[in-house]
Amino acid sequence: MKSFKFVLIAACAAAIGLNAEVLTKTTDISLGGKKVGKIEVLTPVEVVSKDGAKAKIKLKGAVSANYLAQIQRSVKNAEIFTVFDAESEANFKKIKEVEDDYGELWYEVEGTYEVAADALGSDANALYKQAQQKYEETCSACHRLHEPNSFTAAQWPANLQSMIDTNYVSLEETELNLIVKYLQHNAKDAE
């Protein structure tokens, strides 16, 4: 458990850099004043500017050439950062093309979006603690708790969703999103 706490602290330090913040809740994103999708809780972003109730953020990640409707952390890490309402190359700027191990084409991308300023925060630790507590309370009631590094970032969402679908556990969407992000941030690397 000590090594897990060290990983948690290291992940938080990496996520919170100069002008870097995280989303404290899943919220809408806009591009040029038009809603284009949503950005997930605990997504690390660079704050470009704040103006009252709105903030302009910059986000970097990867997009599959075959599915332009979401930005994920990287080609090998399937942690979803944004989900767009429609597939469109106008939602992001392509930085470079990358081919994965299976020959699939991906784009390293960045985008500048508007979000509600109250959805930003710099204390990821508080969110991690909240998620960890909810995960432990909810999941240890039925079985031995899986360590967060038991699965990859791509495996955690389906793992938790299967518990909900079979009615073993009931979680609000906000609780589920927070727990999934916490587990993904501490997941094992994809091979």
Pin down the residues of each PLM region.
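Sec-dependent N-terminal signal peptides
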Residues: 4-14
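Gly/Gly-Pro-rich "capping" loops immediately C-terminal to redox-active cysteine motifs
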Residues: 140, 144-168
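Sec/Tat signal peptide C-region and signal peptidase I cleavage site
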Residues: 15-21
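Boundary regions of SH3-family modules and the immediately adjacent low-complexity/disordered segments
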Residues: 59-127
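Beta-loop motif signature
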Residues: 21-47, 51-53, 61-62
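Short, flexible, mixed-charge glycine/proline-rich loop motifs
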Residues: 129-133
